[in-house]
């Protein structure tokens, strides 16, 4: 009792002193914080002195241009008398590092110039520059009813082909023993992660090699995946995702070995570093040791590769119950949704986009104070070591014009069906399949109560554009579109709408029937071509005039679209009664045509498939007269019909977009701004393809904008009589004469067998297994002929063209994709059933929750 009284007495004596101490501490803290804010404001106004190597230690070999040690700090600071600002020499590495703390780099592409000076001790830890304040929540799937679960595979039994399975497993083990992946992984421990080993791990498990699988996992367990080995200067984020993260997840899903899941979390956490940008879009070529960490994503990136992480991150979020992985995916697809109308082809992204979302302010706009209005404008540093002001639009943009390219060419947008673009369609569909159509990644809507929580900062960050910038857009004749398409804050651009319109564009403008050496009755062979577009907005008519030029170059990667379309035909469309979608029968028909065309190509090239090739389009498709004639082609070449010129831009006829009389693409309203300039804004319209008109909204005049397509002259290869000798190519006698160009032939490619596998699993038709058996026979025969040695021995090697850099290692896609698809094609239908599993872009397996 006496102790309690003593404590109480002591408290009464010190409580006034304690209160004074707390008050003084708070006063000191806020005074110190105010000093920090003042220093930061100096930095924001360029009031800090330039820093050189005499003042700061810059140990480490900088990749930037070396500073001029003969000049002093005062020599590097000059006053700009016109605007009263201090011009800082950002080419000095130390100065650049200091300024980069406050101003992000805005670069066209990643390069070694961004530096690599971080001390080793700081590489394991990472503090985000742009942390997420409100994460999207991963949607719950617990309330999905059995009636909502769709079936991909047919109800019939799909029995195994035991003989083919044995042949494929034998080839896998021959390849595995030849490569000695376990030994190589240990020998290369200091220089790289065991990427090839991880990439082939799930196929090893499917082959039933339990002992080898456990040995492999034991080796992988010894690696630190929190950061890469120091020898790995630059990390290809899409490649690391598809081969390492997906490989670890897939092996975990099959074996349930939690060591693999822990390693997958480490890899994913490292990949998340690349998302630490002002708009949370990843840097794909990631220099992880650079001390210049404050960066926008690159201004020239392959559009589809921005979605590569989607499936792995979503599945990892489900497994770990951590929202940060799902949040990263949702923000990328939110930006895609905002960009659906930014480019010439609506609902399509070109090959290359500006991922920074930055619209640079002009000098006139800066002088008029536009850079001071709105939180969406950030002062940044470009690749020329100059300050620029970037207005963040929250969407992907056209990449900046290359000064070295022809002005005429740089005005075109390129759309191809290849590895740069297909992942967007593929991942949109497979995410929909993963969620069993209960959640839409584009519009953020869910059938469940636990839908993804919207980040309140999204949308509010992109403020209304200042009238000065609006004037510039109007004078330049560019269309001014809102980045939103919402009614009552609910998006009308969902995955179904995006996929439907994107595939419709492909069907209409990017498919062609080629001239082939032989035509089979009742067979229609089609390939997917590329297009170049150029547009001009006509304010007087409120039309976007888009000129389209077709180029009949084909990427072998486009053969994957056959399987993707086939899969999409088995998933019911999501949406209301007025939602437009492509009939499953049409999707299935096109998927069969593409897959059969690619298989025909494999036969014609004896398995040596060109990664890129160029064909002649059929000139008499109406009558079905598409058989190639070498004499006719030689005559056309002699007559100069294949001679082309850079500015050969003759246009053809105008065509409407979808259906009769064109398609009203987007409702608009004209709003008169303060200075009399008319601004065209988006009105929240109906779903794509609808002709519903909106007469009046909020008393504003409403007009309709529509795309008017003009078919320009086809782009042909430049061929003269000097390139031919009779009915064959002079410099490439091994090329078929019906093919105008062949690039990078490969033998072990997986694109065609992947589509054949999908077509069999969704239909159960034996013709697809027959194609698979034929293609495997062609592959084995070609391998033995090209790589035979003494005493009948032969090795498995990839084929490389003369002059190409030869890699003696087997490519890991041979294990992770090619052999896996062959194995699953001939396995029992319940083995990795598509009703319960999804195969990712990298060929890895994740479960549907």
Swiss-Prot record:
Write down the glycosylated positions: 45
GO molecular function annotations of the record? calcium ion binding; mannosyl-oligosaccharide 1,2-alpha-mannosidase activity
Q: Which GO terms describe its cellular component?
A: endoplasmic reticulum; endoplasmic reticulum membrane; membrane
Its Enzyme Commission number(s) read 3.2.1.-
Q: Which residues lie on this side of the membrane: Cytoplasmic?
A: 1-12
Work out whether the entry's keyword set contains Zinc.
Answer: no
Instruction: Kindly tell me the pathway this chain contributes to.
Output: Protein modification; protein glycosylation
Q: Which SUPFAM superfamilies match?
A: Seven-hairpin glycosidases (SSF48225)
Q: Where is this region: Disordered?
A: 56-79
What's this protein's family per the entry? Belongs to the glycosyl hydrolase 47 family.
- Other remarks on this protein: Present with 71 molecules/cell in log phase SD medium.
| Protein name stated in the entry | Putative endoplasmic reticulum mannosidase MNL2
Q: Which source organism? A: Saccharomyces cerevisiae (strain ATCC 204508 / S288c)
